[in-house]
């Protein structure tokens, strides 16, 4: 017996061969198996119950496809691994620090194997049956097709992979890298191998079958008072003290007719003995038979077994943990699993038919059995050239494409984002992390801030930090346009300048259509006067103006004017003709020459009418011609006036000169031109109010420099610019103007620079959330998309989202990326946010899990954030290395301490390295506590 036990593992498998396109593993009883490695399609904590149902349907489809005489074995291996990331030698200091911080961090890896096994014929000798062999390969192919059709990632294992898989299972070693075998020592409680033990926990005690009466493919976990869909056994990813957990799930599909007859006979036996227990048993069996008749389900034999590897002294807490978690699911695991070695061997890959039917298997419906199958995978990194690293819910770095449009999987149409998070939610820390990673991947970033949140990272990357002050105000010349910009992109500039002028002139009020028309015309003519100075109207322009003014004149004509004009024409006809000198005739307009000719002809015709010798028909014809000529003379007199008016207009335009482009010259141009337009068009416009309101930005005004100083052209070449305008955030006039011209700077930069560009506006965006700016903001967002850009706004005020239609229409509706941080402070009004952002029930549930999980152990400061890209959303952790924290910090005390180290060591990188080394050497104090000590001594720690 002892000799037999020593060689017990030798007879597990008969053969491993590659045949007919499949690697087939034969058990000792001749049962062939093919092994797929798959990825469970449901991401842990996705909160979407429908995904669990869909995977349940896929597994049910596979069972129906393979049918009787087959077993489906699924093994989910949850093994502790050590994190490693290959960092390029030329990586930035903060990036190297980031991955060094996570190096070696323990995490749970999930690998899933799906094993299809054909039952061997029960006989003394194993015989080759070509039909069964072909059927086996056909079922493997159909299973492959189902997984492909349902978009479940999978692959068949090769020969070496199957061999390694079986050997690793025997050694129970699934950590990456080499592994070795060691001796086994079996007992009734567990198997001992080296310094670890392996224990089996069958989910079902065959003698009692303590399972819930109703079961679903998922369960609900209570988080913040909300039921969140999760896997029935999701707790397996967090079994304490374990280094490896294998959840072995086996379903055998027996002959259905034989089992049905057996159940029907059993129901009759129970019915023949009329006592309460038999009536209940009969009712249960009949319910099962009814289900089988109605639904596409089958009777199956099952075994579910959890194998755990842990130190010998941790068996009790591991057992207690599993029993508690299973009890919460309504499952009482077997307490009589004394056949530990047998259970371990039965769980080997391809051993789906090795279980003892007397005490290892229980009978149930296939739909119920599949509810116990593990369905989750952990969050994975995305395939994308633009990588933004966050952590998953267990603290493992994963990269995503934060734009949603640059990765292999396209999720968005634009990369614009909207971020909301209350004070203290980690909003600025998160944005610092995003900006760092964008900068390190060749993105030009322009930021508008109102609280020095980005001073540290701007200094680290040698960016340009422009802070507004009275001594050095932020000043630009938004009116300056190059000839090329004027010819190619004047429409955009014109709309921006209109928004700027109305922001000053009207504030938050809508401009009237007349005001919009006037300002639009002055801007167009202003640039036309600069780039194409006016000399004279062309013939075609004159004719067009003539027709326009003629229509306007007729529009205002009335009967009295007509009568008066006709009387005047009669006087001219009846007045004695004056002889004109030849030189004066040469100076006449064509219309004047025609007028004189018509008058002479009318006089001749009048003489004919008065001639007694003329016949009546001649007189009538002459009278008709006179009336015709008089109408022409009437029109001709209007044309003469119009021609003179056009001459006057021509002279006015000739006098309008623009020598340089600036607000000053536009102001002068507009004040001269607007009265001319209003007089011509006969419209009203309060030019005095307009002049008075804009005067403060004009020559000699308090804010003259704001719109009349050329911006440093070198700014367009800067990779990172931060505009800090906290000192004017309460100025209702200057604040929105400065924000607006900064946005214009970004648009110019975006057109000039190649590659990715990002404009991020923190709380300052509220300055431009006015009705007059709605169209411009929409335009900005749409234009950014065309030039490989990102426009983002960040806010912490709930009312900004709920109460502003501009936010919804101009910003949210044009932002395919939405970012939310902890929303518990907004819980009472969360329905309003959800409605405006268009959140689904699943997305709401995801948001409720932010910072609500018990996942802080062994991790430093971090906050969680919900990111939605198109329809794809998830919760991520924002956890950074200490070096990154020092670079991002917005705490004044910490910034002052860092400046002391900077003064000592010369470079910010060296200062960050030394201050973090000293903090750890001083006992790993909190950042703020250590900073206080540094500030107290006013010197670096080595000099204390």
What are these model-predicted stretches?
Residues 1-374:
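Extended, folded cores of ATP/NTP-driven motor/assembly subunits in large transport
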Residues 40-42, 76-78, 118-120, 310, ...:
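Short, flexible loop/turn elements at secondary-structure junctions
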Residues 49-65, 331-332, 344-398, 404, ...:
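P-loop NTPase motor domains
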Residues 87-92, 129-132, 171-172, 350-353, ...:
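Short secondary-structure boundary/capping segments
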Residues 87-95, 100, 123-128, 132-133, ...:
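Flexible coil/linker segments and helix-coil junctions enriched in charged and small residues
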Residues 101, 489-541, 805-944:
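P-loop NTPase motor core of the ASCE superfamily
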Residues 396, 404-425, 429-436, 445-454, ...:
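Conserved P-loop NTPase motor cores
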């Amino acid at each position: 017996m002892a000799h037999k036990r020593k060689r017990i593992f030798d007879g597990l498998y008969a053969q491993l061969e590659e045949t007919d396109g499949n690697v087939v593993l034969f058990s000792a009883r001749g049962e062939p198996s093919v092994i797929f490695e798959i990825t469970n399609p449901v991401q842990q904590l996705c909160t979407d119950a429908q995904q669990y149902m869909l995977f349940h349907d896929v597994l049910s489809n596979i069972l129906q496809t393979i049918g009787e005489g087959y077993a489906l074995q699924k093994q989910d291996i949850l093994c502790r691994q050590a994190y490693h990331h290959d960092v390029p030698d030329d990586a930035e200091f903060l990036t190297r620090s980031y991955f060094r911080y996570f190096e070696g961090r323990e995490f749970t890896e999930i690998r899933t194997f799906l094993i299809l096994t054909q039952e061997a014929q029960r006989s003394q000798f194993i015989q080759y049956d070509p039909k069964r062999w072909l059927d086996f390969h056909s079922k493997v192919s159909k299973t492959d097709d189902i997984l492909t059709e349902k978009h479940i990632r999978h692959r068949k294992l090769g020969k070496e992979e199957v061999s390694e898989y079986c050997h690793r299972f025997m050694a129970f070693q699934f950590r990456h890298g080499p592994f070795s075998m060691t001796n086994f020592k079996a007992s009734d409680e567990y198997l001992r191998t080296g310094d670890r033990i392996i224990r089996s926990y069958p989910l079902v005690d065959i003698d009692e079958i303590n399972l819930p009466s109703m079961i679903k493919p998922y369960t609900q976990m209570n988080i913040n008072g909300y039921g969140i869909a999760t896997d029935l056994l999701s707790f397996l990813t967090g079994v304490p003290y374990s280094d490896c957990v294998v959840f072995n799930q086996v379903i055998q599909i027996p002959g259905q007719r034989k089992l049905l007859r057996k159940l029907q006979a059993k129901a009759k036996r129970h019915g023949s003995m009329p006592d309460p227990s038999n009536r209940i048993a009969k009712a249960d069996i009949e319910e099962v038979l009814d289900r089988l008749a109605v639904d596409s389900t089958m009777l199956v034999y099952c075994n579910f077994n959890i194998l755990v590897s842990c130190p010998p002294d941790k068996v009790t807490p591991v057992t207690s943990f599993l029993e508690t978690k299973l009890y919460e699911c309504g499952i009482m695991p077997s307490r009589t699993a004394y056949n530990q070695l047998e259970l371990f061997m039965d769980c080997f890959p391809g051993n789906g038919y090795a279980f003892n039917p007397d005490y290892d298997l229980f009978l149930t419906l296939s739909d119920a059995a599949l509810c116990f199958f593990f369905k989750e995978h952990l969050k994975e990194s995305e395939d994308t050239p633009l990588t933004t690293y966050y952590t998953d819910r267990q603290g493992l770095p994963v990269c995503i494409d934060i734009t949603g449009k640059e990765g292999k999987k396209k999720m968005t149409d634009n990369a614009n984002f909207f971020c909301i998070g209350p004070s203290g939610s980690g909003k600025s820390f998160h944005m610092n992390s995003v900006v760092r990673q964008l900068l390190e991947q060749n993105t030009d970033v322009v930021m508008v801030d109102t609280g020095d949140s980005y001073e540290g990272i701007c200094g680290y990357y040698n960016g340009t930090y422009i802070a507004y002050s009275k001594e050095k105000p932020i000043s630009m010349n938004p009116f300056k346009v190059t000839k090329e910009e004027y010819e190619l992109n004047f429409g955009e500039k014109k709309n921006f300048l209109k928004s700027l002028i109305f922001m000053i002139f009207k504030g938050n009020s809508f401009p009237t259509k007349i005001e919009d028309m006037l300002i639009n015309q002055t801007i167009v003519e202003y640039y036309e006067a600069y780039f194409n100075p006016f000399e004279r109207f062309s013939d075609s322009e004159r004719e067009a103006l003539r027709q326009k003014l003629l229509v306007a004149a007729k529009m205002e004509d009335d009967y009295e004017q007509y009568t008066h004009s006709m009387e005047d024409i009669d006087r001219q006809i009846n007045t004695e003709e004056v002889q004109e000198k030849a030189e004066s005739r040469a100076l006449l307009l064509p219309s004047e020459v025609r007028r004189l000719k018509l008058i002479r002809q009318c006089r001749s015709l009048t003489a004919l009418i008065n001639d007694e010798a003329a016949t009546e028909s001649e007189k009538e014809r002459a009278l008709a011609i006179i009336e015709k000529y008089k109408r022409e003379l009437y029109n001709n007199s209007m044309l003469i006036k119009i021609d003179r008016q056009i001459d006057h207009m021509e002279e006015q335009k000739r006098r309008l000169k623009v020598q340089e482009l600036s607000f000053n010259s536009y102001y002068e141009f507009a004040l001269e031109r607007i009265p001319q337009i209003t007089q011509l068009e006969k419209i009203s416009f309060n030019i005095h109010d307009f002049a008075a309101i804009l005067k403060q930005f004009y020559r000699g005004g308090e804010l003259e420099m704001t719109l009349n100083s050329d911006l440093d052209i070198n700014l367009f070449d800067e990779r990172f610019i931060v505009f800090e305008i906290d000192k004017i955030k309460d100025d209702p006039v200057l604040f929105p103007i400065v924000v607006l011209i900064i946005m214009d700077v970004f648009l110019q930069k975006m057109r000039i620079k190649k590659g990715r560009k990002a404009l991020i506006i923190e709380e300052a965006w509220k300055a431009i959330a006015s009705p007059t700016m709605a169209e411009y903001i929409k335009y900005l967002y749409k234009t950014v998309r065309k030039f490989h850009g990102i426009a983002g706004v960040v806010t912490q005020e709930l009312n900004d989202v709920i109460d502003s239609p501009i936010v919804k229409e101009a910003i949210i509706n044009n932002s395919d990326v939405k970012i939310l941080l902890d929303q518990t402070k907004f819980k009472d009004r969360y329905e309003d946010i959800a409605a405006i952002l268009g959140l689904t029930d699943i997305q709401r549930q995801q948001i409720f899990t932010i910072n609500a999980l018990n996942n802080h152990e062994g991790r430093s400061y971090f906050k969680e954030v919900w990111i939605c890209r198109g329809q794809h959303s998830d919760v991520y952790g924002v956890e950074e290395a200490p070096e990154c924290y020092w670079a991002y910090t917005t705490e004044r005390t910490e910034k002052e301490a860092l400046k002391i180290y900077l003064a000592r060591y010369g470079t910010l990188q060296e200062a960050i390295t030394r201050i973090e080394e000293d903090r750890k050497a001083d006992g790993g104090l909190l950042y703020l506590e250590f900073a206080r000590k540094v500030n107290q001594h006013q010197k670096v720690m080595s000099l204390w």
